[in-house]
Amino acid sequence: MEAPIRNPFTVLIDSAESQPWTFDGLRADADKGDAPLHVPYEFANLGRFPDSLGDYSIAGLVGHVAVERKSLEDVWSTILGWTTDYQVERGINGRRERFKRELQNLAAIPAGIVVVEAPLERCILRMPGADGLNYNEDSHEGSNEQRGKHTVRENRKIFFRSVVSWQERYRVNWFFCGSRRAAEVFAFRYLEKAWEHYLERLTPRERKQFRGAIA
């Protein structure tokens, strides 16, 4: 059995995450023998609306790097303003406006992105609507009333134009990945690069102090 290599930083996962990534099955770079990579993670409060700072960060770098995770159902309901059973139970309203505030928060930090667990094509082509097209994969449930009053065609326009507009307005990049696993790997590699680039900007003394502070 190959001995795993411990990742040099700890991933912080927001304690409100309902389906968290745990970064299992990753491997180190070739210069480290392509060994299995053990990624330590901890659950933490990364902020609550209106001060939320994404779903994932790095210990010691909260407020510097953040990844906002969106499942397919979540990105639909957020952009189109639908109310899911989960949100009704928790009294969460106005998801679209709340998310715009979250994007403002991401834009204010050096490295903040949105990662979606589905490709853009799937988000568009499988769009439900009030005129009869229902999405019934995975755990998606809910009435057409919860999904809004717009037709599929209208929903597609609203969704696509919102994604384009919000990226231009808030300067926060969105990455639509081919699957949940692809999104998980992408998010980790983004955090990894943000960690490396942060350390590169420190002097040797500052780097030593920083590593000691988060050990």
What residue spans do the PLM features occupy?
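Non-catalytic C-terminal interaction segments of nucleic acid-processing enzymes
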Residues: 1-63, 76-215
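Conserved catalytic cores of phosphodiester-cleaving nucleases, focusing on short active-site segments
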Residues: 65-71
